[in-house]
Design a protein with these regions (language model features):
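C-terminal alpha-helix
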Residues: 109, 113-121
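Conserved alpha/beta-hydrolase fold motif
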Residues: 16-19, 41
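Catalytic histidine-centered segment of alpha/beta-hydrolase-like enzymes
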Residues: 91-106
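A conserved short beta-strand
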Residues: 36-48, 56-57
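Acidic catalytic loop of the alpha/beta-hydrolase fold
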Residues: 64-69, 93-94
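Gly/Ala-rich beta-loop-alpha elbow adjacent to hydrolase catalytic centers
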Residues: 19-30
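Short beta-strand/loop motif that positions the catalytic acidic residue
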Residues: 54, 58-62, 66, 74
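Serine-hydrolase catalytic machinery in alpha/beta-hydrolase-like enzymes
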Residues: 1-16
Length: 121
């Protein structure tokens, strides 16, 4: 895969690099992390073809009703490969459930875990 912009940076100059990505961006971030041996990543609603590049040090969120990804496949892959996985019950590809109160509570929990995850790196 050719990354015309990434070559402008000396990635070895950084102690850690964290990508936070969503949907199709999870594939790009995961492939970059794999190829350049980067630090952990946070993936929101990854697509099925992203899975082969996920690593144990990653954090993954997926909705149980994601219309663009196979939730069961992602969940099983993460569990089998010991990747931290969080499901959003009734969440779609935007992790929205259709209930604003539930969505706000989910978002609070997600952001708390993202914050602690980042501080743990």
């Amino acid at each position: 895969m050719e990354y015309s912009q990434i070559h402008k940076f000396d990635l070895k100059a950084y102690d850690s690099i964290l990508f936070i990505s969503k949907s199709i961006g999870t594939y790009c971030a995961a492939k970059l992390a794999h190829e350049y041996k980067l630090t952990a990543n946070i993936y929101f609603t990854p697509l099925d073809f992203t899975l082969e590049y996920l690593q144990q040090k990653d954090l993954v969120y997926s909705g149980t009703k994601d219309q663009w990804a196979n939730f069961d496949k992602i969940e099983h892959y993460c569990i089998y490969h010991l990747i931290e996985f969080h499901s959003i019950v009734d969440g779609n590809h935007s992790l929205e459930t259709g209930n604003i109160q539930t969505d706000i509570e989910n978002l609070k929990q997600i952001m708390y875990r993202v914050e602690t995850f980042i501080h743990s790196l």
